[in-house]
Amino acid sequence: MRNRLNSAQKQHYYRELLSIGIPIIIGQLGTIVLGFADTLMIGHHRTEELAAAGLVNNIFTLVLVSYMGFSYGLTPIIGRLYGMEKTNEIGGKVRNSLFANIIVGLIFTLAMVILYFNLGNIGQPEELLSLIRPYFIINLVSILFVGVFNTAKQFLDGIANTKVAMWVMIFGNVVNIFGNWLLIYGVGPFPELGLAGAGISTTGSRILMALIMVGVIVFKKEFKQYGRDIIKSSITKDDFKEMNRLGWPVALQLAMESAAFTLSCVMVGWLGTIPLAAHQIMITISQLFYLVLSGMAAAIAIRISHFVGQKDYAAVKRNAYDGWRINIMLSLLLGIPVVLFRHQMGGLFTDNVEVQQYVSVLIILMMVYQFGDGLQYSFANALRGIACVKPMVTYAFIAYFVISLPMGYTLGFPCGLDIIGIWLAFPVGLTIAGYLFRRRFIKEVDKLAANKTANA
């Protein structure tokens, strides 16, 4: 392994990054296919259900992205140990991470229960609340299972095995789409449940994926030793504190980014059902870019954590910049067909002509913020790979809460630009976040390299 990783004389690491990143992207693309399928099926069932799903999905995205961010604290720990060839210590870290993730999942579940009883106080259309409430409760059941899946996935990612999670996610999403078809429309003996049916199918697939991942780690020969180490290890105060020290800053950083979109969704809801439905379609389309960029960014974190274990800081920098360049190219490749067919995209999700017109305009704004999005994902994950996560919280707060959200509100309402104004703020916040993350990454890696030289 050391010979394979230790190659600082290389000029670029595109092939190695792609070999790790492509399975992550493919697995995550299964999620976007699922999102498209959900939105397509719900939108053609009832437009009101599409708007209700948009609100609930945005709220849960905030929670699930934060939860995923917390689990990300495991990756640099596992990656560093893997790079140092100390694989016997990995099992204990995974067990402590699982315990920490369960505690955090319970906290998130309690917070969502409190929010459920206050759904009528956030200014949403009254006609949507009867659809929102049951869909909200059904999704609530799946939170803890998402935490189990995340822990297993971050462990496997840390040891550079990204294909298992890819196949599990693809399988789970196929099951989900089939379940949607049966339960939204009431095929055969199944009842026509509409939006509630989509929620039941999604929750069921999340539970199934968590159980499969646990089974793979415990019973598959390749991972059996890790599974034994996880089972026989114990919860320790130091490891538990380490998981929280690395997990919470990433969770908060991702939460603030997601909150900017979620609170923007709430503001769009003030404009009415039609803009909210268009916003939901745009969030679904933009997830295609998000999952591709974040998948490659995850590969950046994995590769960097391995080289940190070897103290090869030249390779650390090269992997970060090579990953960023790949993300720029991926954004361009994805963006060209989306822009060319922007007038047809809305029609895939709904027959409402007014919603389709909104979507065709918002697609242009979505493409504008792809540069900033690629920059901030790449260097946020580069910071995660070197386990420098605390500064990310401050930078995210400045970019999203001090700049992006107030700007979106000002342009949308006092300036009268409505949903266009709200969306104009996204590229500004994302680009500022990316610049701050990149600057901090360079500073920290230079410091690590200087310490290595001083101690040589």
Segments (PLM) and residue ranges:
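Short alpha-helical transmembrane segments in multi-pass integral membrane proteins
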Residues: M1-G21, I78-L144, F190-G247, I304-Y369, ...
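N-terminal transmembrane alpha-helices
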Residues: A8-L40, H44-H45, T61-G73, I77, ...
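Transmembrane helical elements of multi-pass membrane transporters/channels
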Residues: S19-D38, I138, G172, S205-M209, ...
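Hydrophobic residues within alpha-helical transmembrane segments
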Residues: I22, I26, V56-I59, F99, ...
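Helix-terminus/linker motif at the lipid-water interface of multi-pass membrane proteins
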Residues: L29, V33-A51, L119-E126, L182-L193, ...
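Small-residue hotspots at the loop-to-helix junctions and early N-terminal turns
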Residues: T47-N58, I132, F136, G199, ...
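Small-residue-rich hydrophobic transmembrane alpha-helices
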Residues: L50-V113, V146-A165, C265, A278-R342, ...
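Short runs within selected transmembrane alpha-helices of multi-pass transporters and secretion channels
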Residues: S71, T75, N139-D157, A165-N173, ...
